Design a protein with these regions (language model features):
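Conserved N-terminal beta1-alpha1 strand-loop-helix module at the mouth
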Residues: 1-70, 75-76, 80-86, 167
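Short beta-strand/loop segments at the ligand-binding rim of alpha/beta enzyme cores
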Residues: 1-4, 61-69, 117-130, 179-188
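Glycine-enriched alpha-helix->loop->beta-strand junction motifs that scaffold or abut catalytic
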Residues: 36-38, 62-64, 83-89, 123, ...
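N-terminal active-site wall of soluble small-molecule enzyme domains
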Residues: 44-119, 137-138, 152, 172-176
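C-terminal helical cap(s) of enzyme catalytic domains, especially alpha/beta-barrels
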Residues: 60, 103, 164-165, 219-237
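Catalytic cores of alpha/beta
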Residues: 75-84, 135-145, 188, 192-207
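Histidine/lysine/aspartate-rich catalytic loop segments that bind and position anionic ligands
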Residues: 127-179
Length: 237
């Protein structure tokens, strides 16, 4: 079964908007696990506009499922993740000024750089996933870089799905199939929600993990976080 990793960045954004520690990010992560989530995802950025470095350390001590830390592999980021050693690091080529991640790596162009980063993380026994666009060439070069997994950027899928679900699925089939054929683990994330998640998993049942944050928090405003997580888990069965 595909695992659900809950991205809690939005919870940290809410906390930081008011100061103090409400909501408690670490408590929220633990509760997500209690409600069935099989992982917690965070994406600390240099300006700490949501997740802070201290959060990552606390989460490492408290999370009992899988901790996935996303980020651009700067020296500062690599120092953080090699210190805490999360279950998985997802390499994302985002600029510090970006509101959210909006493209994957050009793994062919940056092959040598990514190889070096992957080797560094593997030395600490950290599973490495590389965030890529749905392009089979990018998937192949992620494998050449030594990645354990790729995470397919599903922003375009979500956008297409609203207009033409079949077209959205077919646009991702070459990349998803390539990952499966190569024996490369495949994650997916960005703009997945209660409407578009199940068709994606039905089309690509070898998806190892989905990372979902924004939609889960939006749904939780109406359903509550416990029921929301159950709704997503039901779609992944």
């Amino acid at each position: 079964m595909t695992k659900l990793s809950v991205n809690i960045n939005k919870v940290a954004t809410l906390r930081n908007a008011r100061g103090g520690n409400m909501p408690d990010v670490e408590r929220f992560a633990v509760d997500c696990e209690l409600f069935g989530a099989q992982g917690i995802t965070v994406h600390p950025r240099p300006d700490e506009r949501h997740i802070r470095k201290e959060d990552v350390y606390q989460l490492k001590a408290m999370v009992t499922t899988e901790l996935n830390v996303e980020g651009n592999p700067t020296d500062e980021f690599l120092a953080l993740v090699t210190d805490i050693r999360p279950t998985q690091v997802t390499l994302v080529p985002d600029d510090p000024s970006q509101l959210t991640s909006n493209h994957g790596w050009d793994t062919r162009r940056h092959l040598d750089f990514l190889k070096g980063v992957v080797n560094q993380l593997h030395a600490y026994r950290i599973r490495v996933s590389i965030f890529v666009d749905p392009d089979p060439v990018m998937v192949e070069y992620a494998l050449r870089a030594g990645a354990d997994r790729v995470e397919l950027y599903t922003g375009p899928y979500a956008e297409m799905f609203a207009e033409n679900p079949k077209k959205a699925i077919e646009a991702y089939r070459p990349a998803a199939t390539k990952a499966h054929e190569l024996g490369l683990g495949m994650n997916a994330g960005h703009d997945l929600n209660l409407k578009n998640l199940k068709p994606f998993i039905q089309a690509f049942p070898w998806t190892a993990e989905v990372s979902i944050g924004h939609a889960i928090i939006c749904d939780a405003l109406y359903l509550g976080i416990q029921e929301t997580i159950q709704e997503y888990l039901n779609l992944l069965k």
